[in-house]
């Protein structure tokens, strides 16, 4: 069984890497892929060996949570968590501002005249009270606002793993404990040795405040990256209008039993002189019920302006224009703006909108089996999938935190050994804390998945369904594209008499799809060699190749020939994409580096394909390649700046400038602010993909 499960509590790539490792190591789990930006885990497992509750317990042990309860709304959980995070952030700012005011001597400024006229014991008592009040405020900040950092860090260290929570917990706790020691024993321990001591409650508070602020902004930005999924989910109906089938059948029987030769008077009294479908619609009773209660075979009523709640078959249809049909907007599936006429026996899909008329629809696929649910699942799985570069980053993130801990310890020891002033210990501790805080695996971890999530969502809005991140990344390298002719490049003419089709001109038998030539021209200008495969005779194949602007074509081909061409091009060192729509294309689709299916093709072709074009507009082909190139470029930008940030900031926090005579370094407080900004900037940079023109 394969299932996508929401994960709560992940903050950095180390978090997602540890959750993935934990799930992958469980007996019965075949594969697990955890998405930080998607906040979900896609798990393939044997339900006879391992259960969801066992997975939940394993993940809970390291400080995270799997949401497996069907009665828990993911959107509601995310809303509640965001509200809680917002409250913690605001409260932490209050604590931090108060501590900063005390540490900056605002009390001395307010009561300066009184303190100056007081004796030394009063002044000492005042200073001691200020420090103790700062201690209490910092402790309250830790307990109420930073509690999750410490709880998660304890759980993770107990199981031998470490994430951003460990860095934050250790840095703030060291600053707090060192300051607490100085508050009560500073004069007794340091003053006799000639060491000037300080407290750093302000640093302890501000680290938590800045990290919480960064996460709040990050959550806001990540929610924006998931906008496409929310839009798709918004197409799902929550309720449906269930028709009383027993009454409807009685109406049908009554209408069928009425003799066609009834007098005019009785005909006038009836809703229609004929067995008008509107008769059944107007006289069928119904009730509004939750969509989850609908089962296959139920008949539902859909009115103008409403979304079709399930996949089904039209039982009855009527509109003010016609007595036996209605018009449905299928733009969310096909991308075509023109409403489609639906009559009795026609299929309708969930999420589509009835533009005019009334429909009675018999449910065929409901809930998770509907076309819309499948599209949502495909997009979620694609956004949760990982590009090859992300797997490398995850491996780095797994060791990043332990390496930072070692660097922090090395900084502490180095300053103690080479320091030449009496204040070397406080300075060494502050430098070590700054290294812990400023190192940010989050920026590296978010670099790839945020860009992928935005681009896959943008692709879905443009009727391009990408099944996995690897395909999206590989599209940029396409050098050759093999396109099947019939159904992909051309549309058969449904109006002709096929018994005499051979005697008709080629352009009457079928027609080139709109914008096909424009799409081919664009592909060629992008450096892609296009090959057309056709089962037609050579003259027909040449004709359609010329119409489409394709230089390379093959005629009278069999399914094996398509596969052979793909293999031949690959042997020449080219990255090959195959575009098809039928069962006879599946061998070539499976072999190609990137497989692309038309959304109106066979289910087999779409199952094999990595990318599905939901509309017949072939301009989506160059658009998908262009999107891939922009996405990979964005990922490289994000990774470059994330690595540069860590390479530059860690030495500055450790105090390297002192070695060159520059008496300046990044303090723990500013380190936390820079760390928060680095993560947010990566997410905001990825969001630029939403606004690019394809």
What does each model-identified segment do?
Residues 1-130, 244-245, 252-255, 265, ...:
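Flexible metal-binding regulatory segments at protein termini and peripheral loops
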Residues 17, 466, 476, 489, ...:
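Conserved ATP-binding TGD loop and adjacent catalytic N/P-domain core of P-type ATPases
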Residues 27-45, 49, 53, 198-201, ...:
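Conserved cytosolic catalytic loops of P-type ATPases
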Residues 75-94, 152-175, 376-408, 432, ...:
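Soluble-to-membrane junctions at the N-terminal ends of transmembrane alpha-helices
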Residues 84-239, 395, 666-668, 694:
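Transmembrane helix-loop-helix hairpins at the membrane interface
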Residues 96, 399, 427-443, 666-681:
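Small-residue-enriched core segments of transmembrane alpha-helices in multipass membrane transport
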Residues 109-115, 119, 177, 458, ...:
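Membrane-embedded alpha-helical bundles of multi-pass transporters
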Residues 430, 440-501, 505, 588, ...:
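Conserved catalytic phosphorylation-site environment of P-type ATPases
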């Amino acid at each position: 069984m394969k299932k996508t499960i929401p994960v709560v509590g992940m903050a950095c790539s180390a978090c997602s890497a540890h959750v993935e490792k934990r799930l992958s190591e469980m007996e019965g789990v075949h594969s697990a892929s955890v998405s930080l930006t998607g906040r979900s885990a896609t798990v393939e497992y044997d339900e006879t060996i391992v259960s969801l509750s066992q997975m939940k317990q394993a993940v809970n042990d390291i400080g995270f949570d799997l949401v497996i309860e069907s009665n828990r709304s993911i959107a509601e959980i995310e809303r509640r968590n965001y509200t809680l995070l917002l409250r913690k952030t605001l409260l932490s700012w209050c604590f931090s501002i108060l501590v900063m005011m005390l540490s900056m001597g605002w009390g001395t400024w307010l009561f300066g005249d009184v303190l100056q006229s007081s004796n030394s014991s009063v002044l000492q008592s005042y200073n001691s009270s200020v420090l103790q009040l700062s201690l209490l405020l910092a402790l309250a900040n830790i307990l109420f606002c930073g509690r999750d950092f410490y709880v998660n860090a304890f759980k993770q260290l107990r199981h031998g793993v470490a994430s951003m929570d460990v860095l934050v917990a250790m840095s703030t706790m060291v600053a707090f404990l060192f300051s607490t020691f100085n508050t009560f024993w500073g004069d007794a321990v340091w003053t006799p040795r000639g060491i000037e001591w300080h407290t750093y409650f302000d640093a302890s508070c501000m680290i938590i405040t800045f990290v919480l602020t960064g996460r709040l902004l990050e959550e806001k930005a990540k929610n924006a990256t998931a906008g496409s999924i929310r839009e798709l989910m918004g197409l799902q109906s929550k309720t449906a209008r269930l028709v009383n089938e027993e009454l409807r059948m009685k109406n049908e029987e009554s209408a069928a039993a009425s003799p066609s030769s009834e007098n005019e008077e009785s005909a006038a009294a009836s809703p229609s002189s004929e067995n008008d479908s509107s008769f059944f619609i107007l006289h069928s009773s119904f009730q509004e019920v939750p969509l989850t209660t609908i089962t296959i075979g139920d008949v539902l009523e859909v009115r103008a302006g409403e979304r079709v709640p399930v996949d089904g078959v039209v039982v009855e249809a009527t509109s003010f224009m016609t007595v036996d049909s209605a018009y449905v907007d299928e733009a969310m599936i096909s991308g075509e703006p023109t409403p489609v006429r639906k009559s009795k026996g026609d299929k309708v899909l969930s999420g589509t909108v009835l533009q005019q008329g009334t429909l009675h629809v018999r449910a065929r696929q409901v809930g998770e089996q509907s076309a819309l649910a499948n599209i949502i699942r495909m997009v979620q799985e694609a956004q949760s999938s990982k590009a090859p570069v992300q797997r490398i980053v995850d491996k780095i993130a797994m060791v990043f935190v332990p390496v930072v801990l070692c660097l922090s310890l090395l900084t502490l020891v180095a300053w103690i050994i080479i320091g030449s002033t009496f204040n070397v210990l406080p300075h060494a501790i502050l430098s070590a804390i700054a290294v812990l805080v400023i190192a940010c695996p989050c920026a590296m971890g978010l670099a790839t998945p945020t860009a992928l999530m935005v681009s896959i969502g943008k692709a879905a809005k443009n009727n391009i369904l990408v099944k996995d991140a690897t395909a999206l990344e590989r599209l940029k390298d396409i050098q050759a594209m093999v396109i099947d002719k019939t159904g992909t490049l051309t549309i058969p003419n449904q109006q002709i008499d096929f018994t005499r089709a051979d005697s008709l001109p080629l352009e009457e038998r079928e027609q080139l799809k709109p914008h096909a030539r424009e799409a081919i021209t664009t592909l060629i200008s992008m450096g892609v060699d296009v090959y057309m495969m056709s089962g037609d005779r050579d003259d027909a194949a040449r004709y359609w190749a010329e119409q489409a602007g394709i230089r390379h074509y093959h005629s009278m081909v069999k399914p094996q020939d398509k596969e052979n061409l793909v293999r031949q091009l690959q042997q020449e060192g080219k990255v090959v994409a195959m575009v098809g729509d039928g069962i006879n294309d599946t061998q070539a689709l499976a072999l190609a580096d990137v497989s692309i299916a038309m959304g109106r093709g066979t289910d087999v072709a779409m199952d094999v394909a990595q990318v599905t074009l939901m509309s017949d507009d072939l301009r989506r082909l160059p658009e998908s390649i262009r999107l891939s190139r922009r996405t990979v470029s964005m990922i490289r930008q994000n990774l470059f700046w994330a690595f540069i940030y860590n390479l530059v900031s860690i030495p500055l926090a450790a105090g390297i400038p002192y070695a060159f005579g520059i008496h300046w370094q990044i303090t723990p407080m500013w380190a936390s602010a820079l760390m928060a900004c680095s993560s947010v900037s990566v997410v905001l940079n990825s969001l630029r993909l939403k606004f690019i023109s394809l």
